[in-house]
Amino acid sequence: MNTVRVTFLLVFVLAVSLGQADKDENRMEVQEKTEQGKSYLDFAENLLLQKLEELEAKLLEEDSEESRNSRQKRCIGEGVPCDENDPRCCSGLVCLKPTLHGIWYKSYYCYKK
């Protein structure tokens, strides 16, 4: 009986020690793979970041060109007095002398075209 116990104990100790070695090996392999994966992910992340920055620069450039050309400065609305030499009427309005109901004011007003 003792020999069976000793044999069983010996096999158990060997299995545990070999299992620990395999566990350490597996842990090292997993660490190496994650480090390689991290370096690959860092590379992919940097590449994606560069592409996004390029796209953002292009979009901002287009927006700035659009806003520079199409932006309307402060304007005067319909029925508001304006200066005939420097009309600042909004788009779709023209600075004209009033016809009937504003003749006595002697100034120009913004009217629809």
From Swiss-Prot:
UniProt main location, coarse: secreted
Similarity section: Belongs to the neurotoxin 14 (magi-1) family. 01 (HNTX-16) subfamily.
Organism: Cyriopagopus hainanus (Chinese bird spider)
Comment on protein domains: The presence of a 'disulfide through disulfide knot' structurally defines this protein as a knottin.
Protein name as annotated: U11-theraphotoxin-Hhn1a
Function, in words: Probable ion channel inhibitor.
Domain of life, per lineage: Eukaryota
Residue numbers spanned by region Disordered: 61-83
Assigned keywords, A-Z: Disulfide bond, Ion channel impairing toxin, Knottin, Secreted, Signal, Toxin
First and last residue of the signal peptide: 1-21
